Amino acid sequence: MDSRDIPPSHNQLQPPPGMLMSHYRNPNAAASPLMVPTSTSQPIQHPRLPFGNQQQSQTFHQQQQQQMDQKTLESLGFGDGSPSSQPMRFGIDDQNQQLQVKKKRGRPRKYTPDGSIALGLAPTSPLLSAASNSYGEGGVGDSGGNGNSVDPPVKRNRGRPPGSSKKQLDALGGTSGVGFTPHVIEVNTGEDIASKVMAFSDQGSRTICILSASGAVSRVMLRQASHSSGIVTYEGRFEIITLSGSVLNYEVNGSTNRSGNLSVALAGPDGGIVGGSVVGNLVAATQVQVIVGSFVAEAKKPKQSSVNIARGQNPEPASAPANMLNFGSVSQGPSSESSEENESGSPAMHRDNNNGIYGAQQQQQQQPLHPHQMQMYQHLWSNHGQ
């Protein structure tokens, strides 16, 4: 017996039950098919990628992607992957095409390169024009009149229509003026401001409107209804806060007359404020500058009632135009209880072309102003009447 042939030992490890093993003769021999686990799944195939041209690799990837898409569609039941079922791919191809279209950024051009306007008006639809024509023809048969088509709405211009401001003045009962010109009147120390304004109005037939003034006064006579005498005289240094008024021209029986009024608000040395209508002197304590404006008022002719015309009565004389705003009550003359102011004989704001300046005693005979003249600045002081 050869020593090389060693009999198998009884102590050799036996395979566990349930496992088949081949005979231990050749360890390098191929494994028995009994050792290979059985499986119903197909083996995973790993295709080799060519290392050649890059274009070939891209083509291979595209073919593989198409195969995967076809299998996915078949598994979902959307088709067999044929070209007829390609549009049902959830819009993937449409999205890819939209991404390929380049979108222009920014606002579109208003003018084309040739210089013409790119944004033109859309032409009128022929259906709309035909409908409008048929509507006009139908209106002819129904109404029997002229069946013209409805004109397009006219574009309305922006701003106030011409002539509307004059209508507003007519509604307020006033008239407009023309040729407004500003002026500055210099009043020296010790001069009467009211007399200066009246002297300035004598230079022409224009209406005077007092706008403002700056300076101080030393003596002023004001009309105040709360006082027992009705007229109060203040002496001292008073700063002018506001000075306003007007000088009006009006005709009575063919003669031109002037009538004016003046209102002032003054600040005393102790901080108190006094004011009212000026009925006498307004003496300047320092040099005073008065800013006035002159213009030509367009007076309206009074309307004659049909009753007066039928009876042959003369119409009422025209009074001062009502468009001027009176910035204070018109002085009707000093009160009979104050004798000191009557004896002073200070000039008032009434003047006639024939008689000149009326004194304080003659003011009661002067014709009063138009009753429609307005009162302003009455709320600035509680003691002011009218």
Swiss-Prot record:
Region (Disordered): 1-175, 303-372
Motif Bipartite nuclear localization signal mapped to chain: 102-110
Polar residues composition-biased segments: 126-135
One GO term describing the cellular component: nucleus
Stored Gene3D superfamilies: Hypothetical protein, similar to alpha- acetolactate decarboxylase, domain 2 (3.30.1330.80)
Gly residues composition bias: residue spans: 136-147
Assigned keywords, A-Z: DNA-binding, Nucleus, Repeat, Transcription, Transcription regulation
Ranges annotated as DNA-binding: 102-114, 155-167
UniProt entry tagged with the keyword Zinc: no
Localization annotation: Nucleus
Listed GO MF terms: minor groove of adenine-thymine-rich DNA binding
Highest taxon, organism lineage: Eukaryota
Record-annotated PPC domain positions: 174-316
Residue ranges, compositional bias (Low complexity): 54-70, 328-337, 361-372
InterPro entries to which the protein is assigned, alphabetical: AHL, AT_hook_DNA-bd_motif, PPC_dom
Amino acid composition bias (Basic residues), ranges on this chain: 101-110
Cross-referenced PANTHER family: AT-HOOK MOTIF NUCLEAR-LOCALIZED PROTEIN 8 (PTHR31500:SF51), AT-HOOK MOTIF NUCLEAR-LOCALIZED PROTEIN 9 (PTHR31500)
Chain's role: Transcription factor that specifically binds AT-rich DNA sequences related to the nuclear matrix attachment regions (MARs).
Record comment regarding domains: The PPC domain mediates interactions between AHL proteins.
Protein's recorded name: AT-hook motif nuclear-localized protein 8
Organism: Arabidopsis thaliana (Mouse-ear cress)
